[in-house]
Swiss-Prot record:
Keywords: Amidation, Disulfide bond, Ion channel impairing toxin, Neurotoxin, Secreted, Signal, Toxin, Voltage-gated sodium channel impairing toxin. It holds the Pfam family Toxin_3. Beta toxins bind voltage-independently at site-4 of sodium channels (Nav) and shift the voltage of activation toward more negative potentials thereby affecting sodium channel activation and promoting spontaneous and repetitive firing. Is lethal to mice but does not show toxicity to freshwater shrimp and crickets. It comes from Centruroides tecomanus (Scorpion). Residues 1-19 form the signal peptide. GO terms for biological process: defense response. Has the structural arrangement of an alpha-helix connected to antiparallel beta-sheets by disulfide bonds (CS-alpha/beta). This is Beta-toxin Ct1a. Belongs to the long (4 C-C) scorpion toxin superfamily. Sodium channel inhibitor family. Beta subfamily. SMART domains: Knot1. It is found in: Secreted.
Length: 87
Protein backbone atom coordinates (compact mmCIF):
# COMPACT_ATOMS: atom_id res chain seq x y z
CA UNK A 1 0.00 0.00 0.00
CA UNK A 2 2.81 2.40 0.87
CA UNK A 3 4.58 1.75 -2.42
CA UNK A 4 1.37 2.48 -4.35
CA UNK A 5 1.02 5.76 -2.47
CA UNK A 6 4.65 6.68 -3.24
CA UNK A 7 4.23 5.89 -6.95
CA UNK A 8 1.09 8.03 -7.12
CA UNK A 9 2.83 10.92 -5.35
CA UNK A 10 5.83 10.70 -7.71
CA UNK A 11 3.61 10.72 -10.79
CA UNK A 12 1.73 13.77 -9.50
CA UNK A 13 5.00 15.57 -8.83
CA UNK A 14 6.38 14.74 -12.28
CA UNK A 15 3.24 16.12 -13.89
CA UNK A 16 3.63 19.46 -12.14
CA UNK A 17 7.37 19.85 -12.79
CA UNK A 18 7.35 19.20 -16.54
CA UNK A 19 6.60 22.30 -18.59
CA UNK A 20 5.14 22.68 -22.04
CA UNK A 21 7.43 22.87 -25.09
CA UNK A 22 6.84 23.58 -28.76
CA UNK A 23 7.68 25.52 -31.89
CA UNK A 24 7.43 29.30 -31.74
CA UNK A 25 4.63 30.37 -34.08
CA UNK A 26 3.81 33.59 -35.91
CA UNK A 27 0.15 34.15 -35.03
CA UNK A 28 -0.65 36.14 -38.18
CA UNK A 29 0.74 33.60 -40.69
CA UNK A 30 0.53 30.35 -38.72
CA UNK A 31 4.16 29.56 -39.62
CA UNK A 32 7.00 28.49 -37.35
CA UNK A 33 9.84 30.95 -36.79
CA UNK A 34 12.66 29.70 -39.01
CA UNK A 35 16.30 29.38 -37.96
CA UNK A 36 19.37 28.00 -39.67
CA UNK A 37 22.01 27.62 -36.94
CA UNK A 38 20.95 24.37 -35.28
CA UNK A 39 21.34 23.90 -31.52
CA UNK A 40 21.98 26.82 -29.19
CA UNK A 41 20.74 29.88 -31.01
CA UNK A 42 20.62 33.45 -29.66
CA UNK A 43 17.84 34.41 -32.08
CA UNK A 44 15.52 31.62 -30.93
CA UNK A 45 16.32 32.22 -27.26
CA UNK A 46 15.57 35.94 -27.62
CA UNK A 47 12.31 35.37 -29.55
CA UNK A 48 11.04 32.70 -27.14
CA UNK A 49 11.74 34.92 -24.14
CA UNK A 50 10.13 37.92 -25.81
CA UNK A 51 6.92 36.01 -26.54
CA UNK A 52 6.72 33.74 -23.47
CA UNK A 53 8.68 35.54 -20.73
CA UNK A 54 12.12 35.51 -19.15
CA UNK A 55 11.78 31.95 -17.84
CA UNK A 56 11.46 30.47 -21.33
CA UNK A 57 14.35 28.85 -23.14
CA UNK A 58 14.85 28.35 -26.84
CA UNK A 59 17.06 26.73 -29.44
CA UNK A 60 16.98 25.80 -33.13
CA UNK A 61 15.58 22.32 -33.81
CA UNK A 62 14.83 21.03 -37.33
CA UNK A 63 15.18 24.59 -38.71
CA UNK A 64 12.48 25.99 -36.43
CA UNK A 65 12.72 27.81 -33.08
CA UNK A 66 11.82 25.33 -30.31
CA UNK A 67 10.77 26.95 -27.02
CA UNK A 68 11.08 25.28 -23.62
CA UNK A 69 9.81 25.93 -20.07
CA UNK A 70 6.52 27.43 -21.27
CA UNK A 71 3.37 27.91 -19.22
CA UNK A 72 0.64 25.36 -19.92
CA UNK A 73 -1.62 27.78 -21.86
CA UNK A 74 1.17 28.93 -24.22
CA UNK A 75 0.17 28.77 -27.88
CA UNK A 76 2.66 26.85 -30.04
CA UNK A 77 2.73 25.53 -33.61
CA UNK A 78 0.51 24.26 -35.21
CA UNK A 79 -2.33 26.71 -34.73
CA UNK A 80 -5.80 25.16 -34.94
CA UNK A 81 -7.52 25.87 -38.27
CA UNK A 82 -4.61 28.01 -39.52
CA UNK A 83 -2.14 26.75 -42.10
CA UNK A 84 1.21 28.30 -42.90
CA UNK A 85 0.23 29.88 -46.22
CA UNK A 86 -0.47 26.45 -47.66
CA UNK A 87 2.87 24.93 -46.56
Amino acid sequence: MNSLLMITACLALIGTVWAKEGYLVNHSTGCKYECFKLGDNDYCLRECRQQYGKGAGGYCYAFGCWCTHLYEQAVVWPLPKKTCNGK
